[in-house]
Amino acid sequence: MLYTQEHLELQRSVKKFIDTEINPHVDAWEAAEIFPAHELFKKMGAAGFLGINKPQEYGGMGLDYSYQLAFVEALGDVNCGGVPMAIGVQTDMATPALARFGSDELRREFLAPSIA
């Protein structure tokens, strides 16, 4: 797939986030045998990264799946395997079914806080 300037800008933003919020901490997290998912996911949600292809009315960006692919590709810059896997579970396993099949009530209660 050929990325547009918008795809590339998203990747630059994700890589900058990785360089400042993830990679400097990976070794310490692994040494302490922790993964501060709640803290990290809140930062990622605030940056819009957890709702790239989720509906805007629930806090997502409402973009098509090609932007999610660009995001996942950028996660390859993380200096470990577990963190991108956890992010992928959140963005591509846990929330898609809720976004697609959940009632409006469930989306408001569970989807919105999990992507924002």
Q: Where is each model-derived feature located?
A:
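Mature N-terminal segment immediately following signal peptide/propeptide cleavage
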Residues: 10
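Intrinsic disorder at enzyme termini
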Residues: 1-6
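Glycine-rich flavin
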Residues: 23-116
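Short amphipathic alpha-helical coiled-coil/interface segments
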Residues: 14-15
